[in-house]
Amino acid sequence: MSVPAAKKLWRGIAFSFAIIFAYATVLVKLSHDWWNDENYSHGLLIPFIIGYIIWSQRDKLARVPAQPSVLIGGAAVVCGLFALWAGVAGAELYTQRLSLMLLLAGTVIYFWGFSLLRLLLVPFGLLFLALPIPAIVFNKIAFPLQLFASRCAVWSMGMLGIPVLRQGNIIELKPLNSFDTKKLEVVEACSGIRSLMTLLTLAVVFAYFTHSPSGNGPKSGKRFGFLRDYWFWRATIIVVSAVPIAILTNAFRVSGTGVLAHYYGTQIADGFFHSFSGWAIYIMAFILLFGIGILLDRFKPVQAEGARSVERKSPEPESAVSMNPVVSAEGSEL
């Protein structure tokens, strides 16, 4: 191993140990949340997915010329460390976790530059989606989703002629062969946050692994060339569509539970059906995402379809022209 390579290796090892030491508590608590909070249980797979992406792209990443930006990268690292200190002082876990992303991004910019950071946007995005959001933000999102799901359930049951009444996120109905009114509460776990976060992550992974190698970055060296890239917009549409798909499929699940509760009793909302319907909704949502990907590919521009083959075509070398004899004005060969 050459001396420069050995220095880079030891520098990477030292930096890794420094991050582990500084963020040991943050990483332990993050792992605990992934293991115990079902809304973010997909986070357990994120390190392996990120590792696979980086490993599969290792040759391409190694070919990126190092263009370090010491000033911007150093400023980002300092801001990350300050955010870590502020998060610890204020006992705010989300700030501490975001500081880790800022520190990692700053390190990449400091040593390699923005070119490498652009290639790592997907791993950074996956890590961001795995961070549990603050409780105050979670509640602001979850409760409106609970109300939306309960409204959809009441509307669906009304369309089927089922007598039902809604009070907030509580659905009152009278099951068949029962003289008592039963209540179904659309609790926080049924808000759809879990399926929303999981499906967003799945959409990013699906869009990344089904894109063409020809659509990896800006075209013709232009800064905003990616805005004219079909594969960029395909990935954007797939990821954005994950939000309404997750919300609507969860509302469909709650509606189905309400209908079955009318015919078979409210106990249907617990036990096997509750778990089975959750997995069924995930499968349905992914099928819809997959269908959107297929639909977009049907409208794929010709230039996007043939971009890879065109890029592999080598232009006719200019030297071939110079091999022909040049005739002067007098007709003699030069």
Locate predicted features.
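Hydrophobic N-terminal alpha-helices or hydrophobic patches in metabolic proteins across all domains
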Residues: 1-334
